């Protein structure tokens, strides 16, 4: 019978962000493969421990609730991340984690550089144009090739609508995270 890792129960902090999921074992020494939800998995790689929850739908898991997984090593590998964790010492233990969702507290993310933003910080921000006209609230961001696009949700005549604005300096004048607002050079009829 395979030896399953012993994981410490933990509370999921209110600022926890889902950053990826464990997809498979990698090798025979307990390493496992992770699908990061960002093209730049910096927050995942910088964390000394991850919070895991079982897969949402249908997958079997040997643990319930939230558990703490101390990370020994993590690095990028092609378009994924491979990691090795404390207590995960062979392929069977790594396979037992398959499907687990990975969370990291937002407070533990590395500091973003100038004019760099974590998507999680932009979602929910109201967007106004230079004239102060409300254009909507950021509902999502889409990678659209050379740039990212803001997806705004707004209502018009009582019906929900979407508006898309390229997230580039030609249209985005200011992102004020402290003031919780994005100002753009955009009109409601675009």
UniProtKB/Swiss-Prot annotation:
- Show which residues constitute the signal peptide: none
Q: Name one GO cellular component term.
A: ribosome
- Where mainly found? cytoplasm
Cross-referenced InterPro entries: PRC_barrel-like_sf, PRC_RimM, RimM, RimM_N, RimM_N_sf, Transl_B-barrel_sf
Q: Which UniProt keywords apply?
A: Chaperone, Cytoplasm, Ribosome biogenesis, rRNA processing
Subcellular location field: Cytoplasm
Q: What are the protein's GO molecular function terms?
A: ribosome binding
The record places domain PRC barrel at 114-190
* A Pfam family matched in the record: PRC_RimM
GO process terms (BP): ribosomal small subunit biogenesis; rRNA processing
Q: Tell what the record comments on domains.
A: The PRC barrel domain binds ribosomal protein uS19.
Q: Which HAMAP family match?
A: Ribosome_mat_RimM (MF_00014)
* Self-association state and partner proteins as the record states: Binds ribosomal protein uS19.
Described purpose of this protein according to its UniProt entry: An accessory protein needed during the final step in the assembly of 30S ribosomal subunit, possibly for assembly of the head region. Essential for efficient processing of 16S rRNA. May be needed both before and after RbfA during the maturation of 16S rRNA. It has affinity for free ribosomal 30S subunits but not for 70S ribosomes.
Provide the family line.
Belongs to the RimM family.
Task: Write down what this protein is called.
Answer: Ribosome maturation factor RimM
In its UniProt entry, the species of origin is given as Acidovorax sp. (strain JS42)
Q: What is the lineage of its organism?
A: Bacteria, Pseudomonadati, Pseudomonadota, Betaproteobacteria, Burkholderiales
Gene of origin? rimM
């Amino acid at each position: 019978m395979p030896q399953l890792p012993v994981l410490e129960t933990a509370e999921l902090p209110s600022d926890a962000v889902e950053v990826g999921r464990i997809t498979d074992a990698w090798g025979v020494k307990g390493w496992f493969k992770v699908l990061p939800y960002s093209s730049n998995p910096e927050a995942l790689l910088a964390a000394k421990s991850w919070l895991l929850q079982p897969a949402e739908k249908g997958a079997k898991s040997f643990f319930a609730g939230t558990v703490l997984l101390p990370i020994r090593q993590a690095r990028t590998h092609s378009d994924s991340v491979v990691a090795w964790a404390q207590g995960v010492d062979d392929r069977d233990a790594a396979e037992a984690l398959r499907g687990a969702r990975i969370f990291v507290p937002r407070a533990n993310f590395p500091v973003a550089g100038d004019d760099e933003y974590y998507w999680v910080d932009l979602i929910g921000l109201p967007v106004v144009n230079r004239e102060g006209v409300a254009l909507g609230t950021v509902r999502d961001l889409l990678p659209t090739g050379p740039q990212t696009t803001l997806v705004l949700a707004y209502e018009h005549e009582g019906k929900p609508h979407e508006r898309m604005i390229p997230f580039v300096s030609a249209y985005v004048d200011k992102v004020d995270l402290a003031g919780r607002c994005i100002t753009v050079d955009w009109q409601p009829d675009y």
